[in-house]
Design a protein with these regions (language model features):
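Radical SAM enzyme [4Fe-4S]-AdoMet core and its adjacent flexible, acidic
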Residues: 8, 148, 156-164, 168, ...
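Accessory C-terminal segments flanking Radical SAM cores
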Residues: 216-332
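Recognition helices and adjacent regulatory flanks at domain boundaries
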Residues: 1-24, 37
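Radical SAM/AdoMet-radical enzyme domain recognition
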Residues: 63-83, 90-210
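A short acidic, helix-capping loop that chelates divalent metal ions and anchors anionic groups
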Residues: 49-53, 124, 146-154, 216-220, ...
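Short flanking/linker segments adjacent to small metal-binding domains or redox-active Cys/His motifs
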Residues: 80, 324-352
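Canonical Radical SAM [4Fe-4S] cluster-binding loop centered on the CxxxCxxC motif
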Residues: 19-61
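Conserved, mostly hydrophobic/aromatic
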Residues: 31, 39, 83, 207, ...
């Protein structure tokens, strides 16, 4: 029997399940479409130059609107909130929003798992206040320890040392364990895989290698630039013996691998070569309040209009529940020449 024919049995916790039996447990909330980097796989500078028109402020969800939406999603079973962008740390007064989100409680009274993904450029300045506001952990995007290679990936001249200092600040503030995401693109930064792994083993951060993905249409994605997760694991294992580790929770997207010598662990996110659609429990809200049920979605659902109308919470709850009940996304499972021509939303706009 194919997996899509067999609904998955989640554990009876509250909330809807989609047409493939997947519950809604994770919500990624973009707080801005702006970013100070121009990463080649997300916002290439050739397209998103200095004159690019980002969203005007009145089209971006307010902190109050974000918090209201998050509270409704939590009532439907969401247990993990991740704040994203763009680059979320460019959003003014972000610790205030973190405090508002941290105050939300699950139906059973438990606290949420509140996390944030950042490029790390402003972490030294903000890590302490984010932790004080209730943030639990951070994930930092870092594609190389070499300044030249890092610049080739992020599109600007920004010192690796400042990102590393931001990671140190996050650890000092208690936002640990820090995870570091490394997108690997053949011909640009695959030579950085072993240096990054060595650094992660020495510092205790959890490094996660991400296959270069075809999100949006601006990054010029080509399959031959993808370094398969299996190759990455083989590269690591040739230096340090590794063994597979069990996932820490249902729906975890990274395959976990443990160093046999006790030197920590690393992860691989293999959306291209080993899709994880069957366990995807994620919903996404963009900075302008559009709900997406897949990272590769062609369109979404306007929550901002509901949030800014006179609609009471139960009406918005019903709308979100209906959207999830009808969800049947599995783009990565179906990836082909045909799907590559479908319209898709850019990663920075959706809040990947």
């Amino acid at each position: 029997m194919r997996w899509m024919d067999a609904p998955l049995a989640f554990d009876g916790r509250p909330g809807p399940t989609d047409t493939l039996g997947r519950a809604m447990r994770d919500l990624r909330i973009s707080v801005t479409d702006r970013c100070n980097f121009r990463c080649t796989y997300c916002m290439p500078k050739e397209i998103f130059g200095k004159d690019y028109a980002f969203l005007p402020r009145d089209q971006v969800l307010t902190f109050e609107e974000i918090t209201r939406a998050a509270r409704i999603f939590v009532s439907l079973g969401v247990e993990k909130l991740r704040v994203t962008g763009g680059e979320p740390l460019v959003r003014r007064d972000l610790p205030d929003l973190i405090a508002m989100l941290a105050a939300i409680r699950r139906p059973d009274g438990g606290a949420l798992d509140l996390t944030l993904t950042t490029n790390g450029s402003a972490l030294r300045a903000l890590a302490g206040s984010l932790a004080d506001a209730g943030l639990r952990r951070v994930t930092v995007s870092l594609d190389s320890l070499d300044d030249a290679v890092f610049g080739a990936m992020n599109g600007i001249e920004f010192p690796v040392a400042r990102v590393l200092d931001g990671i140190d600040a996050a650890i000092e503030a208690g936002l640990a364990p820090v995870k570091v995401n490394m997108v690997v693109r053949r011909g640009i930064n695959e030579s950085s895989v072993l240096p990054m792994a060595t650094w992660a083993r020495e510092t205790g951060v959890i490094l996660r290698f991400i296959e270069y993905m075809d999100v949006g249409h601006s990054n010029g994605w080509r399959l031959d630039e993808v370094v398969p997760a299996a190759d990455l694991i083989e590269t690591i294992a040739a230096v340090w013996p590794v063994e597979p580790a069990e996932p820490t929770y249902r729906g975890e997207v990274a395959g976990r691998w443990r160093y046999a010598d006790g030197g920590g662990e690393f992860g691989v996110i293999s959306s291209v070569t080993q899709p994880f659609c069957r366990d995807c429990t994620r919903a996404r809200i963009s900075a302008e309040g559009v709900l997406y049920t897949c990272l590769f979605a062609a369109d979404g659902h306007d929550l901002r209009a509901l949030l800014r109308s006179d609609a009471p919470d139960p009406e918005i709850t019903d709308a979100i529940e209906t959207i999830w009940l009808r969800r049947g996304d599995r783009y990565s499972e179906l990836r082909s020449a045909a799907t590559s021509t479908l319209p898709r939303i850019e990663m920075f706009a959706m809040g990947g």
